Structure formats: structure tokens, C-alpha cells
């Protein structure tokens, strides 16, 4: 399922991400704000267990998450999305995937994988600001499926139709939460209008 999340604050912060004059610190802050809002949407239907809790005055019914959440940022730009989420639950763990797309081809290189122990009872959320050709995300999903999590979702900021269509065709049960669906990919496979290289803008590199 593709879910473009409609929210005034997302549009406000997305404009900052797109602006070429936005500073590195401003870019980080805007990325955090959008990631938080997308995370709320991605998790609002998570299964809950009923528990009894005692307030200072009485016992009452409460709820807790049934399953852990495992965040898997795709290095390096996905690393900038972690802090926006980890503060929301003590049931959040973090794995890492190192994958990059070769600029002149559609092939991808996987160079690092480190996952929490036993994620078979967890909901995995892949974090990557950009969904361009879809090849990086397909590689990530394939790798994570080897660990047999309950569910895989994706939080991305901006996506191109080409990448969305490719991933949805291969993995229709993976939910993808987005702030924007842009026009197209250019000849160099960058998203247009996009927001530039998210990793460079996030970390102040070129």
C-alpha cells in the first residue's frame, strides 16, 4: 500500500527540505519533523495488548504494544531519521543496512548488515528519505525478509513514480508512507524536483 500522508506541517517542512538555501541544521530539523509525522501514521494501527494499570486512585484498563518495532535505516541518509522516532517507545530497537546505488548503473552494492537479535516477532520499519529507482529498497526488503519479521513497512520522504511502481509490484504487502510523490527521475536517476542528495545535505558533505 502506498500512503501519501496529507498534513499541513508536512508540507511546511517539506518546502524547507526542497529549498537549496536551507542550512544543514535546518535540513536536519525539517527531516526530523516530517519523519515523526510519518511515523505516527505508520504505527497508528499497530496491535495492542490489554493490561491493567493502577493509578493513584483506582485500577483501570491500559494498553501496550504487542510487538517490538525495529527501525532499519539505510545508511547513510536514513541515519538522520532515527532520532525522530526512538524517543516514542521503549520497544524500539535499531538495525542498520549499508546499501548504495552505483551512479552510472541501476545495480546496487550491499556492504553492511547489523540487525537486533531475533526480529521474528517485530514490525520492521525501513527508513530512507529518498525512493528513486526502487532498487535500493528492493535489496533492503529482500535482506530483511530473511529474518522473517511479522511485517515490513517503509517511511520515505520523497519518491519517484518509477520506484514506487517497481517496489509495489514486487512487494504489494509492504506499506510505504510518503510525504510526497514527485514527477519523475531524470537521466541520472535523481528525483525531480526532489530535494537534492539527502545524505550530503544532512551531513554537510559534497
From Swiss-Prot:
Pfam families: UPRTase
A Gene Ontology molecular function term of the record: magnesium ion binding
GO biological process assignments: UMP salvage; uracil salvage
Catalytic EC class: transferase
Alphabetized UniProt keyword annotations: Allosteric enzyme, Glycosyltransferase, GTP-binding, Magnesium, Nucleotide-binding, Transferase
Chain residues that bind uracil: 191, 196-198
Cross-referenced InterPro entries: PRibTrfase_dom (IPR000836), PRTase-like (IPR029057), Upp_B (IPR034332), UPRTase/APRTase (IPR050054), Ura_phspho_trans (IPR005765)
Superkingdom of origin: Bacteria
Role of this protein: Catalyzes the conversion of uracil and 5-phospho-alpha-D-ribose 1-diphosphate (PRPP) to UMP and diphosphate.
The protein, known as: Uracil phosphoribosyltransferase
Organism: Mycoplasma genitalium (strain ATCC 33530 / DSM 19775 / NCTC 10195 / G37) (Mycoplasmoides genitalium)
Lineage, top ranks: Bacteria, Bacillati, Mycoplasmatota, Mycoplasmoidales, Mycoplasmoidaceae
Amino acid at each position: 500500500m502506498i500512503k501519501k500522508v496529507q498534513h499541513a506541517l508536512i508540507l511546511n517542512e517539506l518546502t524547507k527540505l526542497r529549498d537549496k538555501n536551507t542550512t544543514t541544521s535546518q535540513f536536519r530539523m525539517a527531516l526530523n519533523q516530517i519523519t515523526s509525522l510519518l511515523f505516527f501514521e505508520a504505527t497508528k494501527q499497530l496491535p495492542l495488548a490489554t493490561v491493567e494499570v493502577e493509578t493513584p486512585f483506582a485500577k483501570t484498563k491500559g494498553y501496550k504494544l504487542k510487538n517490538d518495532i525495529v527501525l532499519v535505516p539505510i545508511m547513510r541518509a536514513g541515519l538522520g531519521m532515527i532520532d525522530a522516532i526512538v524517543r516514542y517507545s521503549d520497544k524500539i530497537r535499531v538495525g542498520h543496512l549499508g546499501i548504495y546505488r552505483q551512479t552510472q548503473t541501476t545495480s546496487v552494492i550491499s556492504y553492511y548488515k547489523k540487525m537486533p537479535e531475533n526480529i521474528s516477532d517485530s514490525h520492521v520499519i525501513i527508513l530512507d528519505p529518498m525512493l528513486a529507482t526502487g532498487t535500493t529498497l528492493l535489496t533492503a526488503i529482500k535482506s530483511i525478509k530473511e529474518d522473517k519479521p511479522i511485517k515490513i513497512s517503509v517511511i520515505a520522504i520523497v519518491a519517484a513514480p518509477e520506484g514506487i511502481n517497481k517496489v509495489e509490484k514486487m512487494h504489494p504487502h509492504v506499506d510505504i508512507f510518503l510525504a510526497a510523490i514527485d514527477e519523475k527521475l531524470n537521466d541520472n536517476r535523481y528525483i525531480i524536483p526532489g530535494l537534492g542528495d539527502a545524505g550530503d545535505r544532512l551531513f554537510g558533505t559534497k
